[in-house]
């Protein structure tokens, strides 16, 4: 069945609807993002349009509708919801045209070729857990569309022993050691291969891997999960959000149940951070390359830096560095 991005999400399960309402009420003004997010979403939409047939009038109409959406209320929307709506506009103007899989398959193929060489690249001083974690983290910053296999491996090698701007890896390892159920939120195609590499290093835990809608651009979907054999190491769950990231208030019943059961939540990428940041959930760890200063200013680091961050722990760290005005 065609999965229309622009249809409004409707959840029939009363328990999920109630939980979503509670989450919405819990979001009280500390969302990540500002006016700069508009230009970021526009760039993402322009990138999506490159995969579609070269229809100049349709592309102009898409960008006009995105600008109108922002002017008519998008400025007050959460960043993830605005991006979801913008992707929906693309789907509306190009109904039933699904151009992404060939591009994503090529991204996965490059990652898989690099994956076959990863074990021989692991430094002797780096544990299997740390190397798996750093490989997954490197995946968040690699351009799998354009990078060669050599460049991909160089990205992993460079990060294997590098100092991170924020490094809560030890806390993550401790929490994983205590956990029975882990929820892992996917980001993009290609990157999913390195997620699998990290998940394989985890033992004694049940892992749920949450994927995105197959029509949401280059986001990792169930199709990608099947292609890279993710189901052999994790239980794959569709998030139901019709977006390039997971959004708490739009999770499917199954994804919501997985969210509630998880002892630890590992999220990839800035969009998942933005979506879950307002929940103040101590279970959440985010692996990403900081994409912009709007994100960096919240975490207290610069754009372009890599982080393994527990947002709640980071809040506490930053609060301790603030000097009272009257001190």
Task: Name every feature range the model reports, one short phrase each.
Residues 173, 196-200, 255-256:
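Short amphipathic alpha-helical segments and helix-helix/interface helices
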Residues 3, 211, 217, 223-327:
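C-terminal functional extensions of proteins
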């Amino acid at each position: 069945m065609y999965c229309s991005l622009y249809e409004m999400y409707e959840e029939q399960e009363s328990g999920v609807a109630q939980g979503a309402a509670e989450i919405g009420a819990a979001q009280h003004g500390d969302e990540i993002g500002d006016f700069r997010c508009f230009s970021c979403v526009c760039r993402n939409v322009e990138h999506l349009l490159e995969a579609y047939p070269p229809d100049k009038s349709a592309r102009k109409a898409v960008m006009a509708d995105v600008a109108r959406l922002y002017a008519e209320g998008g400025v007050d929307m959460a960043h993830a919801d605005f991006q979801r709506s913008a992707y929906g506009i693309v789907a509306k103007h190009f109904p039933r045209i699904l151009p992404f899989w060939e591009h994503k398959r090529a991204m996965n193929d490059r990652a898989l070729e690099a994956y076959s060489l990863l074990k021989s690249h692991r430094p002797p001083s780096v544990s299997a857990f740390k190397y798996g974690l750093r490989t997954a983290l490197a995946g968040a910053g690699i351009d799998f569309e354009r990078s060669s296999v050599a460049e991909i491996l160089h990205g992993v090698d460079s990060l294997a022993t590098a100092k991170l701007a924020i490094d809560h890896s030890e806390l993550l390892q401790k929490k994983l050691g205590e956990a029975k159920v882990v929820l892992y939120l996917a980001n993009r195609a290609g990157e999913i291969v390195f997620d699998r590499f990290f998940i394989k290093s985890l033992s004694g835990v049940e892992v749920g891997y949450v994927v995105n809608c197959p029509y949401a651009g280059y986001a990792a979907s169930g199709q990608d999960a099947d292609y890279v054999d993710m189901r052999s190491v994790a239980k794959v769950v569709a998030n139901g959000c019709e977006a390039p990231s997971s959004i708490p208030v739009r999770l499917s019943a199954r994804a919501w149940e997985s969210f509630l059961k998880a002892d630890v939540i590992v999220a990839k990428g800035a969009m998942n951070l933005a979506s879950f940041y307002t929940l103040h959930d101590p279970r959440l760890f985010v692996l990403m390359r900081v994409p912009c200063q709007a994100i960096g200013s919240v975490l207290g680091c610069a754009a372009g830096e890599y982080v393994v961050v527990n947002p709640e722990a980071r809040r506490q760290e930053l609060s301790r560095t603030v000097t009272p005005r009257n001190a």
